[in-house]
Amino acid sequence: MAKTQAEINKRLDAYAKGTVDSPYRVKKATSYDPSFGVMEAGAIDADGYYHAQCQDLITDYVLWLTDNKVRTWGNAKDQIKQSYGTGFKIHENKPSTVPKKGWIAVFTSGSYEQWGHIGIVYDGGNTSTFTILEQNWNGYANKKPTKRVDNYYGLTHFIEIPVKAGTTVKKETAKKSASKTPAPKKKATLKVSKNHINYTMDKRGKKPEGMVIHNDAGRSSGQQYENSLANAGYARYANGIAHYYGSEGYVWEAIDAKNQIAWHTGDGTGANSGNFRFAGIEVCQSMSASDAQFLKNEQAVFQFTAEKFKEWGLTPNRKTVRLHMEFVPTACPHRSMVLHTGFNPVTQGRPSQAIMNKLKDYFIKQIKNYMDKGTSSSTVVKDGKTSSASTPATRPVTGSWKKNQYGTWYKPENATFVNGNQPIVTRIGSPFLNAPVGGNLPAGATIVYDEVCIQAGHIWIGYNAYNGNRVYCPVRTCQGVPPNQIPGVAWGVFK
């Protein structure tokens, strides 16, 4: 539904104040990529990559304008190549053009030719200047939307937005508040997006035998994974892709599990593999969410799994509800295991079958509750006892760091790393950039590691090579040291 001009004006003011109601608004100073500045509260980071870019603001704005029906793609210059839907019109910027408040300004020429730049018209001004609301004008991708007077240099197009005539937000609100008997609140429903990836996976030829519940070892929500992965291409998918990504109130269906396999268990695609036999769903934000938020993300996954089990005619049991660690050596699902069994596979190694069954039984109970009652509630293990999650546990997900005489911070961690699409130079004996070269870890290669280190501005993983050498491989950049370190974007996928 189109917005009124009053609603649009209110939205732009909220952007400028850093108070906009958006899931992509940064709530506190945040940094995950040392290539850019630390994002201040109020910045918009819609895809979880490269901090608060100019396009992030537009992605959020268009989602709001279209009631979450249209998600933009590409860089700023690509916005004039796509359709936002009914009511949106693309205009060339002519010498006589005076834009209206709320229009989208697109810069594609001159110094903006490579990537483009984009913002929102805050004040149409005149044919010489106008006021733009934008992000990343300074190149550091760290500020909330900021107003600036622009002289139209490089500005080639405007995108006119639909505006609804009629009552304003204030009148509508007053009308509702005058009602003596307000309508009861609707129960929140789970939104499922079927925006499938742009690659056709192999067909299974039958329904899946069950669901593997993963923890994503990442920081993105289901919507953010959709935004970053839907059109990522084969090179990224080869590093691992699940059928579903779930967070509070939202599940992204990346692949149709009823018809196609996914690459989520790391054990090949043979007829007996987890990839072939089972669907896979990621509980999102296992490395960033609070316990309370992560438990809400889990509930979305349980609710969705219950719906799929009904659709597929499956009963939740230990054969149909599976863990990633049952197929390959991995700590996944690490966060869920800590919360619901008290065992930390990252610091304590592989759990016993009894502990794995304890977690599976918890998952099974939650899924059954949704199938039978349509609802469920979380419980956690704290101090060895199961308790309600109304006061979430605060147990740390990672173990304690230690520092050696060389200034290297280190801790044990048993997991798997799948390299991205670029080779990485490894080092022998120590995690230093001037240590002897061990070779190149090829793109797409998988290694099982037992140690994590922070040294020389990088996070390293340590493992024993087949020839007996102790090898260290950098896997991302890192600012600072424990407990206040800020890791950069991972160069591959952790499982």
Swiss-Prot record:
Presence of the UniProt keyword ATP-binding in the record: no
Molecular function GO labels:
metal ion binding; N-acetylmuramoyl-L-alanine amidase activity; peptidase activity
Q: How is the cofactor bound?
A: Zn(2+) is required for amidase activity.
- The entry marks the following residues as binding Zn(2+), namely 214, 324, 332
Q: Where is the Peptidase C51 domain?
A: 29-160
Q: Which GO terms describe its biological process?
A: defense response to bacterium; peptidoglycan catabolic process; proteolysis; symbiont-mediated cytolysis of host cell
Residue span, N-acetylmuramoyl-L-alanine amidase domain: 205-334
Q: Which InterPro entries match?
A: Amidase/PGRP_sf, Amidase_domain, CHAP_dom, Papain-like_cys_pep_sf, SH3-like_bac-type
User: Pfam families, per this entry?
Assistant: Amidase_2 (PF01510), CHAP (PF05257), SH3_5 (PF08460)
Task: Give the enzyme class.
Answer: hydrolase
Spell out the catalytic residues.
54, 117, 134
| Listed SUPFAM superfamilies | Cysteine proteinases, N-acetylmuramoyl-L-alanine amidase-like
Q: Tell me the function of this protein.
A: Endolysin that degrades host peptidoglycans and participates in the sequential events which lead to the programmed host cell lysis releasing the mature viral particles. Exhibits lytic activity against Staphylococcus aureus. The CHAP activity cleaves the peptidic bond between the D-alanine of the tetra-peptide stem and the first glycine of the penta-glycine cross-bridge. The N-acetyl-muramidase activity cleaves between N-acetylmuramic acid and N-acetylglucosamine bonds.
The protein's name is: Endolysin LysK
> Which species is this UniProt entry from?
Staphylococcus phage K
